[in-house]
Amino acid sequence: MNRRYFLFPKVSGEYLITCYQQIDGNQYAALYTETLTIKLQNEFLPFLYPNQYVDFSSKSEACKLAASLVKEDMTDIDILKTFYTYVTSHISYDYDKADFVEAGYLPDVDDTLSTGTGICFDYAALTTAMLRSQDIPCKLQIGYSGDVKHAWIDVYIRG
């Protein structure tokens, strides 16, 4: 079985789920509606697993790299600094990609490693995958820096 994770829900709360069937063209009819009340046992759980933005598995090169960089006596802060230093010194910013990236783009963390290039979304996804693979909760954020679309991470450090 191929397990896929999607970031849903992010937080505890009430969620309305509706399944639609295409009737014709862009017309849809609701087939099923359900309201779910979600109570997360651990608020950081959604930030430890892969999802559509940060897609990885234990076999990913990003996870193998993360494991090779971590030493037994390292704290979460040490690991974060090590991963940050690695990513920022081994990945070059791809200005052409930034100029022509299309809506719906999703990063491939192993492709970013193999090409050694990426945009902010790639940097953030790669670092997030590496941190999550070491059980350090990390949230990838997408928003704007001024009027420029940007991606960055929030890291939750224990202690």
Tell where the protein language model's regions lie, with residue ranges.
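A short, structured loop/turn motif at beta-sheet edges
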Residues: 9-11, 73-74, 158
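Secondary-structure boundary elements
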Residues: 50-114
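Hydrophobic/aromatic-rich core segments of domains that either
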Residues: 122-159
